[in-house]
Swiss-Prot record:
<comment type="function">
    <text>Binds directly to 23S ribosomal RNA and is necessary for the in vitro assembly process of the 50S ribosomal subunit. It is not involved in the protein synthesizing functions of that subunit.</text>
</comment>
<dbReference type="GO" id="GO:0006412">
    <property type="term" value="P:translation"/>
</dbReference>
<dbReference type="GO" id="GO:0003735">
    <property type="term" value="F:structural constituent of ribosome"/>
</dbReference>
<keyword id="KW-0689">Ribosomal protein</keyword>
<dbReference type="InterPro" id="IPR049946">
    <property type="entry name" value="RIBOSOMAL_L20_CS"/>
</dbReference>
<keyword id="KW-0694">RNA-binding</keyword>
<dbReference type="InterPro" id="IPR035566">
    <property type="entry name" value="Ribosomal_protein_bL20_C"/>
</dbReference>
<dbReference type="GO" id="GO:0000027">
    <property type="term" value="P:ribosomal large subunit assembly"/>
</dbReference>
<keyword id="KW-0699">rRNA-binding</keyword>
<comment type="similarity">
    <text>Belongs to the bacterial ribosomal protein bL20 family.</text>
</comment>
<protein>
    <recommendedName>
        <fullName>Large ribosomal subunit protein bL20</fullName>
    </recommendedName>
</protein>
<dbReference type="GO" id="GO:1990904">
    <property type="term" value="C:ribonucleoprotein complex"/>
</dbReference>
<dbReference type="GO" id="GO:0005840">
    <property type="term" value="C:ribosome"/>
</dbReference>
<dbReference type="GO" id="GO:0019843">
    <property type="term" value="F:rRNA binding"/>
</dbReference>
<dbReference type="Pfam" id="PF00453">
    <property type="entry name" value="Ribosomal_L20"/>
</dbReference>
<keyword id="KW-0687">Ribonucleoprotein</keyword>
<dbReference type="InterPro" id="IPR005813">
    <property type="entry name" value="Ribosomal_bL20"/>
</dbReference>
Amino acid sequence: MPRVKGGTVTRKRRKKVLKLAKGYFGSKHTLYKVANQQVMKSGNYAFRDRRQKKRDFRKLWITRINAAARMNGLSYSRLMHGLKLSGIEVNRKMLADLAVNDLNAFNQLADAAKAQLNK
């Protein structure tokens, strides 16, 4: 039985890894072994940080809402509770956008929350 060498398959696999490693510094974009390690690590970082990004944005939105709420004499938690009591269903992303770009609209929402809390 003839010997089968996987030359084309190996070359294709290695070229694929080196293509993914394009732009890396030093030997990480030229040497297969080092490039493969870095591509695997990069994939792990990408996977982890796609989930981390969602947490980071939520933290940013809450920080912005809290800052704007405190200008209206409310804490973040009391503002959110007041909005829930008054039946205003607006998510944190939109509230943060209002707090940054349209402070008057945010102040109206904060007043509605205050009125509901003072009942």
